[in-house]
């Protein structure tokens, strides 16, 4: 073969490999930068979350309002569509005390009509705040009893999750987290259904 052709072929191959390597390096750098940016964002969210809680506690915010702030912040930080906090009372039972969004009740509900002028969110809040679970009952009770979080990636195939007929109350994916301070269990925080339509994963957990 003509030596000039071999030379230029080698030059072209070398240049191609060089630019391919540069492109891969740029893509890797971009991915790394994006990952670092996401980590920084998550760090800011956590810091802001803790700051807001510290401010609320310092201001002497009533417990129910504090729980409501936690539920609201949990929805924002996890990208969930709804959240609910179940507080553990003196008898060990779990009472719904704070709701954010259209949270699916953890028990089957009887279909009843909305009162005149009552919003759907208010209707569900009334149901959830009147919902009392026994310690050990369902996933909420299990988390309260063991102090260990539970991830339900696909709620549609998990027999522990109540499946509601109402589409707006269907559970797709949930994360249950115990509320513990100084080794004392105060209740359980549950976030439901990522707003992006996907499922929660171990990364969120």
Indicate residue ranges for each PLM-predicted region:
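Amphipathic alpha-helical coiled-coil segments that mediate homodimerization
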Residues: 49-57, 62-81, 85-86, 139
């Amino acid at each position: 073969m003509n030596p000039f052709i071999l030379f230029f072929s080698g030059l072209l191959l070398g240049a191609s490999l060089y630019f391919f390597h540069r492109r891969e390096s740029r893509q890797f750098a971009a991915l790394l930068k994006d990952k670092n940016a996401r980590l920084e964002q998550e760090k800011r969210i956590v810091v802001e979350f803790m700051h807001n809680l510290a401010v609320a506690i310092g201001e002497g915010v009533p417990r129910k309002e504090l729980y409501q702030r936690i539920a609201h912040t949990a929805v924002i930080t996890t990208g969930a569509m709804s959240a609910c906090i179940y507080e553990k009372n003196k008898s060990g039972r779990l009472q719904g005390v704070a709701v954010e969004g259209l949270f699916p009740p953890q028990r089957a509900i009887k279909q009843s009509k909305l009162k005149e002028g009552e919003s759907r969110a208010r209707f569900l809040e009334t149901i959830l705040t009147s919902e009392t679970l026994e310690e050990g009952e369902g996933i909420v009770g299990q988390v309260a009893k063991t102090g260990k979080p539970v991830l339900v990636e696909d709620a549609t195939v998990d027999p522990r999750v109540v499946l509601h007929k109402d589409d707006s109350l269907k559970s797709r994916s949930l994360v249950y987290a115990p509320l513990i301070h100084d080794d004392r269990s105060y209740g359980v925080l549950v976030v439901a259904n990522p707003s992006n339509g996907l499922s929660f994963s171990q990364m969120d957990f």
